[in-house]
Amino acid sequence: MLDINYIEQNLDEVIQILNKRNQQDYSEDLKYAVEKNLKRKQILVKSEALKSRKNQLSKEIGILIKDKKNEQADKAKAEVVSLNEQIIKLDEELRIVNDQILEKLSYIPNLSHKDIYFGKSDEDNVEIRKTKHNPLLTHSTPHWEIATKLGLVDFEKGVKLSGSRFLIYTGLGSKLVRAIADILLKRHEKHGYKEIFCPLIVNKSAMLGTGQLPKFSEDMYQVGEQYLIPTSEVPLTNLHANEILTYDMLPLKYTSFTQCFRQEAGSAGRDTKGMIRLHQFNKVELVKITHPDQSMNELESLVKDAEDVLNMFDLPYRVVELCSGDIGFSSAKTYDLEVWFPEQNKYREISSCSNCTDFQARNIQTRFKDKDGKIKLVHTLNGSGVAIDRLIATILENYWDGEKLVLPTILKPYFDNKEFLK
């Protein structure tokens, strides 16, 4: 979440920046939070004054008793009892006000970086670079038909077992998922990421920490008081919650291959066929915990690491910078990698790389001690490296020649050096 003290000191600027996000007006929410923060400070001043008086009286009582001034000691004791009651009352008022501030701030997004483009929707995103359109062969067969024809995926059994937007990888399809995950993890390890095998269920505090809750609760799968992860960004970012790191530990770089779970609320009627939008999907995630001064440089290298994956599979793609109206809730700056789908004749997102600055770190209290011994918040970054189901889908469409799937060179060792699948 945002720093309430920064909001208070820069209210007009914060309102101006935030109101560029989806053209939404956050001014009333921000003013409410500032008003409650002023009340919080007033309560603290009163409480500290009462505690100071209580401490003074406690010392005096000991002296009065020692001097056998019992009547005065009794009066002082009575005042201490009264002070305790007032302090308890103020503590409860403080708790309520703190909850009100946190509740309001939890729905307010991060401040977008000053250099990002202004826009209203994904149509206003800016293309940064792209590779040449050079698919192996041209055709117009959708990936789900290819997957079914080759026996890689059983969509009907997925629906039978779990409902819409679920699928089953079978035989070589299952092997393909494992092969790609292995390729990606090895590549990211080469780039300095530490592999983590993390839980698929996390506590509510972890989801609050990364900003999935409370705003996106309808998109989450809940298991009792816990949640299935929508991305391994959640457990990876929370690895150092409530810790103080040293500056020489930074940057920390983590990668993880997991299943991810999303309700896809609001996606009715979109991508109902195929492997693009699933309730359970496979993804390799990249997370960085960095020094604030280096986070923008680390974002650029994060994008390069994700691009490297697409280059390994020789797939046509482009990099776009998200505009102010399309950027994610926790992000200050985001690049999307979009891969080419010949059958759809358009680019589709396969990776989103974001710098969340100190927005998540403030929630989870991940800090570091700098060279001068000062305690500061880290910056957190995350990106898909990449979404495996979408990667398989685009491989199917770009490497299908109408009769067989020509294997990308990097996959051949996993399939006994075969040239194709049919």
Curated annotation (Swiss-Prot):
CDD domains: SerRS_core (cd00770)
Subcellular location field: Cytoplasm
Presence of keyword ATP-binding: yes
Pfam families to which the protein is assigned, alphabetical: Seryl_tRNA_N (PF02403), tRNA-synt_2b (PF00587)
Sequence positions that bind ATP: 262-264, 349-352
Molecular function GO labels: ATP binding; serine-tRNA ligase activity
Enzyme class: ligase
UniProt-listed GO biological process terms: selenocysteine biosynthetic process; seryl-tRNA aminoacylation
Keywords: Aminoacyl-tRNA synthetase, ATP-binding, Cytoplasm, Ligase, Nucleotide-binding, Protein biosynthesis
Pathway of action: Aminoacyl-tRNA biosynthesis; selenocysteinyl-tRNA(Sec) biosynthesis; L-seryl-tRNA(Sec) from L-serine and tRNA(Sec): step 1/1
Catalyzed reactions per annotation: tRNA(Ser) + L-serine + ATP = L-seryl-tRNA(Ser) + AMP + diphosphate + H(+); tRNA(Sec) + L-serine + ATP = L-seryl-tRNA(Sec) + AMP + diphosphate + H(+)
A cellular component annotation (GO) from this entry: cytoplasm
Binding site for L-serine: 231-233, 285, 384
InterPro entries: aa-tRNA-synt_IIb, aa-tRNA-synth_II, aa-tRNA-synth_II/BPL/LPL, Ser-tRNA-ligase_type_1, Ser-tRNA-synth_1_N, SerRS_1_N_sf, SerRS_core, tRNA-bd_arm
ATP-binding as UniProt keyword: yes
EC numbers for this chain: 6.1.1.11
Family matches, as PROSITE patterns: AA_TRNA_LIGASE_II
Domain comment in the entry: Consists of two distinct domains, a catalytic core and a N-terminal extension that is involved in tRNA binding.
Cited function: Catalyzes the attachment of serine to tRNA(Ser). Is also able to aminoacylate tRNA(Sec) with serine, to form the misacylated tRNA L-seryl-tRNA(Sec), which will be further converted into selenocysteinyl-tRNA(Sec).
Oligomer status and interactors: Homodimer. The tRNA molecule binds across the dimer.
Family under the similarity heading: Belongs to the class-II aminoacyl-tRNA synthetase family. Type-1 seryl-tRNA synthetase subfamily.
Name by which UniProt lists this protein: Serine--tRNA ligase
Gene: serS
